[in-house]
């Protein structure tokens, strides 16, 4: 019960922030075929009940492949796009139609066995997407493969205003009545841009973008995306990342990539600070700045656990209030996640780096290095020549960053006289 109450308290600011916001959610055909699909539907219904305006875009690739195989047809691609001839279009229409019915049934059912028991909602679909043919590229005729020409923004917003969930399929229609097979990623991206959506949420097989070491990349700016695309090459994660960046460049506030295989990934991404996937956004996620008196409470929350473990020297609220101007902090969405302090040592050209701390959830993002660089820059600006640090647990971290072993005797007298021999901290120094 305590964990639930704690989670709800932490989620409450996000619940309020997401109300009446427009989210476009893209779920590929692989996600619909996955056993976790039912849980994703529950989470979408929960978002709807919390006042989120939802547009759901679904894919159909594996379902199309299954129908082609059943008919003995060979799929053809060029530039990673399906070539949709007449027989293939029949398979596309069949797959999309059945998927649409399956999604409508799942979203419309009375979820007797789900956490959202008794929920009722209205689902709307229609000819909201106008398309045009891709035509001929590199001498290859794409036939009925198309691209989005226009999204019926007014029509979709009218349905959202009436509290409906809007379902968009990867099919588009031309003014002359032709049907075109579309990429669901393109439909979702254009819908998010044209609707001025607050978020584009893209489901993939992975938790998000993984770096070359297999570690999750939690945050990106659109301008950082090309380097990752060059590394990824032609794969689906690259397609999702490219779609996320395009949406942000088109004015969408934030794009998220989460896994359809992880239960609760969508809710974790939307209602926790750390999230569960990769966030692509134009705005700055964090700020590195000097602390003010309003930050004292956040600093106490950050450093208290480390003080209790004996890693940091205890500082009372009164001490922090008096010394707040010595601190630099990293703030993320109102939460102080890292800090460090610079104390000039009297009657010398030396300073002390103290109280360097990073929230455990953010210790692999280089924030300690950012704070160290900020403290060193502040020290140089004040004319200091040497930076001392005292530590009981992180000697190697400082050695790796240019600090050399030192001693109490090498410290200026004003600081050496305050050395706590009971803590027996190791002393290091670095020439600036």
Curated annotation (Swiss-Prot):
Pathway: Amino-acid biosynthesis; L-arginine biosynthesis; N(2)-acetyl-L-ornithine from L-glutamate: step 1/4
Transmembrane segments: none
Xref: Pfam families: AA_kinase, Acetyltransf_1
InterPro entries per record: AceGlu_kinase-like_sf, Acyl_CoA_acyltransferase, Asp/Glu/Uridylate_kinase, GNAT_dom, NAGS_kin, NH2A_AcTrfase
Cellular component terms (Gene Ontology): cytoplasm
EC top class named in words: transferase
GO biological process: L-arginine biosynthetic process
Family under the similarity heading: Belongs to the acetyltransferase family. ArgA subfamily.
Name the record gives this protein: Amino-acid acetyltransferase
């Amino acid at each position: 019960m305590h964990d639930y109450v704690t989670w709800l308290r932490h989620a409450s600011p996000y619940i309020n922030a997401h109300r009446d916001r427009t989210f476009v959610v893209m779920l590929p055909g692989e996600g619909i075929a996955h056993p976790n699909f039912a849980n994703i539907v529950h989470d979408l219904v929960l978002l709807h009940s919390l006042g989120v305006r939802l547009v759901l875009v679904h894919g159909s690739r594996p379902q199309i492949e299954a129908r082609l195989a059943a008919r003995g047809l060979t799929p053809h691609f060029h530039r990673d796009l399906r070539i949709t001839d007449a027989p293939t279009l029949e398979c596309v229409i069949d797959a999309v139609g059945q998927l649409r019915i399956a999604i409508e049934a799942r979203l419309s059912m009375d979820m007797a066995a789900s956490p959202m028991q008794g929920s009722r909602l209205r689902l709307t679909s229609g000819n909201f997407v106008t398309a045009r043919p891709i035509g001929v590229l590199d001498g290859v005729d794409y036939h009925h493969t198309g691209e989005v020409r226009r999204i019926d923004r007014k029509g979709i917003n009218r349905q959202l205003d009436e509290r409906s969930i809007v379902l968009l399929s990867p099919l588009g229609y031309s003014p002359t009545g032709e049907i075109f097979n579309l990429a669901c990623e393109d439909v979702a991206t254009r819908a998010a841009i044209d609707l001025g959506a607050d978020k584009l949420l893209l489901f993939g097989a992975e938790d998000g973008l993984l770096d070359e070491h297999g570690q999750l990349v939690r945050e990106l700016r659109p301008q950082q995306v090309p380097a990752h695309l060059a590394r990824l090459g032609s794969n689906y994660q690259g397609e999702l990342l490219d779609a996320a960046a395009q949406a942000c460049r088109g004015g969408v506030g934030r794009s998220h990539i989460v896994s359809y295989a992880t239960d609760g990934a969508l809710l974790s991404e939307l209602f926790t600070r750390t999230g569960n996937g990769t966030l692509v956004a134009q705005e700055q996620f964090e700020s590195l700045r000097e602390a003010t008196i309003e930050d004292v409470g956040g600093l106490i929350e950050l450093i208290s656990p480390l003080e209790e473990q004996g890693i940091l020297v205890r500082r009372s609220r009164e001490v922090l209030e008096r010394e707040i101007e010595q601190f630099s902090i990293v703030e993320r969405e109102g939460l102080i996640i890292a800090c460090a302090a610079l104390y000039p040592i009297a009657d010398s050209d030396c300073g002390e780096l103290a109280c360097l701390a990073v929230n455990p959830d953010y210790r692999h993002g280089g924030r300690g290095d950012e704070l160290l660089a900020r403290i060193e820059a502040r020290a140089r600006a004040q004319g200091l020549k040497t930076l001392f640090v005292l530590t009981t647990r992180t000697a190697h971290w400082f050695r790796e960053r240019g600090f050399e072993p030192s001693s109490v005797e090498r410290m200026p007298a004003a600081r050496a006289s305050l050395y706590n021999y009971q803590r027996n901290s190791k002393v290091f120094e670095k020439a600036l």
